Amino acid sequence: MITSENTDNRATNLYKPSDIEGKWQKIWEDDNLYNTDEQASNKEKFYALSMFPYPSGNLHMGHVRNYVITDLIARFQRFQGKVVLHPMGWDAFGLPAENAAIERGINPDKWTKQNIAHMKSQLKLLGLSVDWDREFATCDENYYVWTQFLFLELHKAGLVYQKESEVNWDPIDNTVLANEQVDSEGKSWRSGAIVEKKLLTQWFLKITDYAEELLQDLEKLNEWPERVKIMQENWIGKSIGTNINFKIKEFKKEKIQVFTTRPDTLFGVTYLAISVNHPLIKKISDNKILSKLENLKIYLQESKDKDQKKIGIPTNLIAINPINSKEIPILIASYVLDEYGTGAVMGVPAHDERDFEFAKINSIDIKQVIIKEKDKITSQLTNAFTDNGFLINSNNFDGLNNSDAKKHISEHGERNGWAENKIQFRLRDWLISRQRYWGCPIPIIKCTNCGSVPVNKKDIPVRLPNEIKISSNKINSLGSNQSWINTTCPKCGNLASRETDTMDTFMCSSWYFLRYPSSKSLTKPFEKEKINKWLPVDQYVGGVEHAILHLLYARFLTKALRDNNLFDIDEPFKRLLTQGMVQSAAYKNSITGKYISPTDIKDITNPKDPKDNSKLEVLFEKMSKSKYNGIDPESVIKKYGADTARMFILFKAPPEKDLEWGDSDVEGQYRFLCRIWKLFLDYSNNDITHEADKLKKENESSLLKSINIAIKEISNDIKNNQFNTAISELMKFYNSISSNLNYVNKDLRRESLMKFCILLAPFAPHISDEIWHLIGNSKSVHLEKWPVFDEDALKENSFELVIQINGKVRDKINVEINISDDEIKEKTLIRPNVKKWIDNKTIRKIIIVKGRIINIVV
């Protein structure tokens, strides 16, 4: 409980965050102040969530920004009288933990849990209003059992399947590598081996079944940043076009199908291009062609410029254009992707820049079939014509604009059986298999009789084995643990083996927000009624780097689980805020490309390389150990306090913009809190003079107006995520209180200070509670209601009248709004500054512009 005994801290006149912040954090925790009140059924709910952190071991300023923003929003919503769910957890599986454990020779579980404990203590230093009772980590058995349960639900719904897929394979370490483990030269980050492509049987989720809904429902997300929606729209990549079948001259029963959005250019097709793994390749027996093909595959694996160089290998096979029966060559092309469309494209050099370049390099005909102006033939093309226009060289379709021609040629193809209208998506199914130890085991048993059989739900979790072996700088995969692998088939009872792949960590992080409302449930992943109550998340906060994968996977799983009747919501996140990066000054030698630590620089105002005395380039870049520009949050909190760190993070830049760290800006926020501290301490010690003869109506009017302006502007700014301008308004409000406090009645003094406390509280919660108690309150300021502004108090009751003599400004005066013209003249003519300009002169005319100006013509 909060008592005067544990909150009275008037012994010092100095603001010392270390004296108050730990104290208030303990009080809040002891009083369960931020535990979600599930019994408050009469209150409106608000679910505030940050993207949960990976437990790397140390908090960085990017974390601080993310969690402080969400905390401010959660606190503001509590002040609105809402019951707030603001939880925290840990995205704990994955390759970084496995690699870190290998380097240290310990179990990833031990390393991860040590990091969680340390990072949790760091997060608590920030004074976050988190409900820690709902905490979990994705590596907890009581969490990943439900990840496996959801996998089985998706399997039952027909959304899980296996197929062969290409992976990055390290031939020295004999392991699969994630894309980020392959460097820019196509080499393994660990062994240095040239990474190979290898076909492995992998598990997939059918996210493509939801492509159309994922695309269409972006329109519902009107509180998401537009750029994130555009990124998802492009990733889903819907194309409306036509599938066209080309016969192959040499193989009468074979056809090549291509997808195109430009059937209007069909008469201009002069070649077909197929990918290096197209099924037609199997029909090729010419050793010279196959040798070139192998060289091309190696080039595509190794080259980072594969999209720049257009390599073509003639197959000596001929396709027949169905629209005009023309024979066209088939080439294997470096730019055709296996995974998009049909693995074959039609080449129209005259009307596609890539095809034009490819045709020039490979000596292929270029045939123009669209011109800009009707009946006006252009000279030979020097580059591709990609604008709209009219058809030429297209038989019966000549003269049509290309928009109409698309429709007519598609219909012609459908009637003749070689074309079909088709909607295609760029989105591919989600590959969730990982050949690593530290992940959620896939609950599948492989039986020689029954094939791949799902584990019975009563037998989950399939636990990770505790005993691991670290050899050759890697943790042996699950496949090397025979006692773990060997089991019996749930279907036939024969000896069988477990699936040795683990799940992509995105599988664990794509449903965690569903777990928080019932995080301690031992019988189900979540309770339907609680999901329907709390979801969607009202405010989700995280980096824009998660715009596609995490956010798209989370949307997909939500829709798939809804269709399994596990709850009724369509979208997981109502409102999304993607915060910018935190950047800091980095010092780079532009000649060597090396970064220099600021501790090695003698004069930071004129930075030079200590080795060669060359001038260093100063860059503001994302904080990084390798660039020596990281700022340790704990050291900042130790020096200035958590409230200062919070105020700086919120004030320095709008949340969606990148933020540049500056020590002077941090010190500026600290000084502001020091001034606040002194003001309230003086008031509590009766050091502010209150003589009745000093009371002035204009001061009271000014302060009352400032109170209401502050409430209105700060409220609107927080609602609109304009936290930096909200702090600017707090500063203005503070200045008004400081200027007027000696000259207003005691009730208004107290009202202004109390409302300032509440308005400050979401930004700087510790000092707010301390000064709240300094002025005589007993309960926490965080239990108060947010003040409401009085519209009448904002109405102007006076204005500044500009006084001109012969059109030149000579004076200004404040007058009441409803003043009459006669009163304006009277007040103006007695002003000393006016008298000296009109004495001994004849006033010819007085012009009054209502509410603005009086001009005296003499």
Curated annotation (Swiss-Prot):
Alphabetized UniProt keyword annotations: Aminoacyl-tRNA synthetase, ATP-binding, Cytoplasm, Ligase, Nucleotide-binding, Protein biosynthesis
CDD domains: Anticodon_Ia_Leu_BEm, LeuRS_core
Top-level taxon in the UniProt lineage: Bacteria
EC numbers: 6.1.1.4
UniProt enzyme class: ligase
Keyword Cell membrane: no
Location of the motif 'HIGH' region: 53-63
Reaction(s) catalysed (UniProt annotation): tRNA(Leu) + L-leucine + ATP = L-leucyl-tRNA(Leu) + AMP + diphosphate
Compartment(s) where it occurs, according to its Swiss-Prot or TrEMBL record: Cytoplasm
Presence of keyword Cell membrane: no
Xref: InterPro entries: aa-tRNA-synth_I_CS, aa-tRNA-synth_Ia, Leu-tRNA-ligase, Leu_tRNA-synth_edit, M/V/L/I-tRNA-synth_anticd-bd, Methionyl/Leucyl_tRNA_Synth, Rossmann-like_a/b/a_fold, tRNAsynth_Ia_anticodon-bd
Gene Ontology CC entries for this record: cytosol
Motif 'KMSKS' region per record, residues: 622-626
GO biological process: leucyl-tRNA aminoacylation
GO MF annotations, alphabetized: aminoacyl-tRNA deacylase activity; ATP binding; leucine-tRNA ligase activity
Disulfide-bonded cysteines: none
Transmembrane spans: none
Family indicated by similarity: Belongs to the class-I aminoacyl-tRNA synthetase family.
Entry-linked NCBIfam families: leuS_bact
PANTHER family reported for this sequence: LEUCINE--TRNA LIGASE, MITOCHONDRIAL, LEUCYL-TRNA SYNTHETASE
Protein name: Leucine--tRNA ligase
Species name: Prochlorococcus marinus subsp. pastoris (strain CCMP1986 / NIES-2087 / MED4)
Upper taxonomic lineage: Bacteria, Bacillati, Cyanobacteriota, Cyanophyceae, Synechococcales
